[in-house]
Amino acid sequence: MRISKPHLRITSIQCYVCLLLNTHFLTEAGIRVFILGCISAGIPKTEANWEDVRKDLQKIENLIQSLHMDATLYTESDVHPRCKVTTMNCFLLELEVISHESRDGDIEETVKNLILLANSSLSSNGNITESGCKVCEELEEKNITEFLESFKHIVQMFINPP
C-alpha cells in the first residue's frame, strides 16, 4: 500500500552545523539559537496531514459521484469545537462503510490512506477525553453527499482551529 505524504519536511542538521562553525556563534546566545533550531526542526508538522486528508476527501467525493451510492451514514452537521476529535473518529468509522459498500479499488485505497493520515494527525492530540459529546450512533443519518460536506467542514476545523 502506497501512502502519499507530499508535505513531509526534510531537515538537514548539516546546515545548522555549518552555520555554527562558519560564524561567530560560539556565544551562549548562539548556542541557544542552534539548540532551539535543532529542536524545532524535529517537531512534527501535522497541518500538512490535514491538507492531505482534505485532498483525499475530495478525491473520494469525485470517485463516489460516478458510482451513485445511496448509503446513509451517521453524520454530525453541527460540530462543537470541544468535540472535534470524537466527531472525527465517528467520521473515520463511517468512511470504512463507504469503502466496504463501494467495492471500488480506488476508493478503498484512498480511504485507507485518508484514515492513516487522519489517525497520525489525531495521535498528535494525545489521548484527549472529550466529555459531553455524542457517540456515533446518536448522530443523524444522512446521505453520502451531506456526510462528505460535514466531513470537509470538520477537517477544516483541524486545519484552521477556532
UniProtKB/Swiss-Prot annotation:
GO terms for cellular component: extracellular space. One of its GO terms (molecular function) is cytokine activity. Glycans are attached at N119, N127, N143. Keywords: Cytokine, Disulfide bond, Glycoprotein, Secreted, Signal. Residues 30-48 form a propeptide. It is found in: Secreted. Its main location: secreted. Disulfide bonds join C83-C133, C90-C136. Residues 1-29 form the signal peptide. InterPro entries: 4_helix_cytokine-like_core (IPR009079), IL-15 (IPR020439), IL-15/IL-21_fam (IPR003443), IL-15_mml (IPR020466). GO terms for biological process: immune response; interleukin-15-mediated signaling pathway; neutrophil activation; positive regulation of cytokine production; positive regulation of immune response; positive regulation of peptidyl-tyrosine phosphorylation; positive regulation of phagocytosis; positive regulation of T cell proliferation. It comes from the Eukaryota. Cytokine that plays a major role in the development of inflammatory and protective immune responses to microbial invaders and parasites by modulating immune cells of both the innate and adaptive immune systems. Stimulates the proliferation of natural killer cells, T-cells and B-cells and promotes the secretion of several cytokines. In monocytes, induces the production of IL8 and monocyte chemotactic protein 1/CCL2, two chemokines that attract neutrophils and monocytes respectively to sites of infection. Belongs to the IL-15/IL-21 family. This is Interleukin-15. It comes from Marmota himalayana. The gene is IL15.
